[in-house]
C-alpha cells in the first residue's frame, strides 16, 4: 500500500531525479512553457510553485535558496525581477498543466507545463509587434504613393 508516499521516482536514483527536477524547473522559469511527459510535469510543478513563492519575498535569503535549486543566474534574476512581481497578489496556482496526447515515438503521454499568465504576456507582445509591422507597412505604402504622384 502507498499510504503517505509522496513524490515521483521517475525511474531514477535520488541524485538523477533531483538533477532532472532542477533542470526542468530552470527551463520552466526561463521559457515559461515547456513540453514534457505528464509525470515529469506533475513532479516539477511543486518545485516551480515553491520557487515563485520564494520570489514574492525578495530577500537575500530567498534569492540564495532559489539559486541553490535553479541552474543559471539568469533564471534567478528573471524569477525575482519579473515573475515575483507578476504573481505578487496571487496565492498559489502559478502553473498550469495541459495534456497534449501521446508522443509519436514511444507513446508516452505528453503535457505542457506553463506559467499562468504567460500566454497573456506573449499574446500582448505579439499583438504589439503585429501592430508595429502594420503601421510600418502603411507608412511605407504612403511614402511609395507620394513618390509615384510626383
Curated annotation (Swiss-Prot):
GO MF annotation terms: structural constituent of ribosome
One Pfam family matching this protein: Ribosomal_L17
A single GO cellular-component term on record: cytosolic large ribosomal subunit
InterPro entries referenced in this protein's UniProt entry, alphabetically: Ribosomal_bL17, Ribosomal_bL17_CS, Ribosomal_bL17_sf
Region named Disordered: 126-150
Keywords assigned by UniProt, alphabetized: Ribonucleoprotein, Ribosomal protein
Origin superkingdom: Bacteria
Known partners and oligomeric status: Part of the 50S ribosomal subunit. Contacts protein L32.
Stated name of the protein: Large ribosomal subunit protein bL17
Organism: Solibacter usitatus (strain Ellin6076)
Lineage: Bacteria, Pseudomonadati, Acidobacteriota, Terriglobia, Bryobacterales
Gene that this sequence comes from: rplQ
Amino acid at each position: 500500500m502507498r499510504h503517505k508516499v509522496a513524490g515521483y521516482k521517475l525511474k531514477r536514483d535520488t541524485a538523477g531525479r533531483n538533477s532532472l527536477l532542477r533542470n526542468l524547473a530552470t527551463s520552466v522559469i526561463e521559457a515559461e512553457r515547456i513540453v514534457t511527459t505528464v509525470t515529469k510535469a506533475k513532479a516539477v510543478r511543486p518545485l516551480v510553485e515553491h520557487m515563485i513563492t520564494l520570489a514574492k519575498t525578495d530577500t537575500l535569503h530567498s534569492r540564495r535558496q532559489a539559486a541553490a535549486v535553479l541552474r543559471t543566474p539568469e533564471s534567478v534574476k528573471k524569477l525575482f525581477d519579473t515573475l515575483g512581481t507578476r504573481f505578487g497578489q496571487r496565492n498559489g496556482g502559478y502553473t498550469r498543466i495541459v495534456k497534449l496526447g501521446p508522443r509519436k515515438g514511444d507513446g508516452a503521454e505528453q503535457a505542457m507545463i506553463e506559467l499562468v499568465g504567460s500566454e497573456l504576456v506573449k499574446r500582448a507582445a505579439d499583438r504589439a509587434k503585429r501592430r508595429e509591422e502594420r503601421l510600418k507597412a502603411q507608412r511605407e505604402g504612403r511614402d511609395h504613393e507620394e513618390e509615384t504622384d510626383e
